Amino acid sequence: KARALKITEELDRTMEVPKPVRMHWTGCPNTCAQVQVADIGFMGCMTRDENKKVVEGVDIFIGGRVGADSHLGDLIHKGVPCKDVVPVVQELLIKHFGAIRKTNM
């Protein structure tokens, strides 16, 4: 939970997003936070970093929604080390949600 808040705060500090983006986070393999129905979903996992060390990471899903036009999000990035999540999500926000980088950081 603390990691999700820290990443979200960094995204808020660095990005201007024109509309709300629903981000769901879970460490539960049963997807208790329903990451597949979020605009961007993060499912905790163990992965390897650039030095092949086992670290905490996330699988990233995008495009989920509920309602009449329901759709499960697609797995777009698998095993992203947590330290690398912010730049990956910044690019997703730009590409899929019309976000821009803030210049007055």
Curated annotation (Swiss-Prot):
Coiled coil: none annotated. Highest expression in roots and hypocotyls. Some expression in cotyledonary whorls. Pathway: Nitrogen metabolism; nitrate reduction (assimilation). It catalyses: 6 oxidized [2Fe-2S]-[ferredoxin] + NH4(+) + 2 H2O = nitrite + 6 reduced [2Fe-2S]-[ferredoxin] + 8 H(+). [4Fe-4S] cluster binds at C28, C32. Its cofactor is siroheme; [4Fe-4S] cluster. One of its GO terms (biological process) is nitrate assimilation. The keyword NAD does not apply. Binds 1 siroheme per subunit. Pfam families: NIR_SIR. It is found in: Plastid, Chloroplast. It comes from the Eukaryota. Siroheme binds at C32. GO terms for molecular function: 4 iron, 4 sulfur cluster binding; ferredoxin-nitrite reductase activity; heme binding; metal ion binding. Keywords: 4Fe-4S, Chloroplast, Heme, Iron, Iron-sulfur, Metal-binding, Nitrate assimilation, Oxidoreductase, Plastid. Belongs to the nitrite and sulfite reductase 4Fe-4S domain family. This is Ferredoxin--nitrite reductase, chloroplastic.
